[in-house]
């Protein structure tokens, strides 16, 4: 399970919906971050790489907004 920080609190729900659309478990936290996990990821490294790819895609599709795996 990894944490992802967003630049805008208003992006919390749209970002979680984006992750869920690619079958990632995503939970919005009160501090404005997202806790995410990839079901069936064989290793933590695989999970990090896959989530990093989704974060990169989100950032490319949403100019001026950013998400970052922390």
Language-model features: locations:
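Generic alpha-helical secondary structure
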Residues: 8-12, 48-51
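Generic "edge-of-domain/loop-turn" microfeature
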Residues: 11, 33, 41-43
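A short, structured beta-strand/loop element
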Residues: 13-33
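Short glycine-/aliphatic-rich beta-strand segments at the starts of folded cytosolic domains
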Residues: 1-6
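C-terminal basic regulatory modules in eukaryotic proteins
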Residues: 37-70
């Amino acid at each position: 399970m990894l944490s992802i920080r967003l630049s805008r609190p208003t992006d919390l729900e749209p970002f979680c919906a984006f992750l869920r659309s690619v079958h990632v478990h995503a939970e919005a936290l009160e501090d404005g971050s997202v806790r995410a996990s990839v079901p069936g990821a064989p290793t933590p490294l695989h999970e990090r790489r896959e989530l990093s790819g989704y974060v990169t895609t989100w950032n490319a599709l949403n100019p001026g907004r950013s998400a970052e795996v922390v």
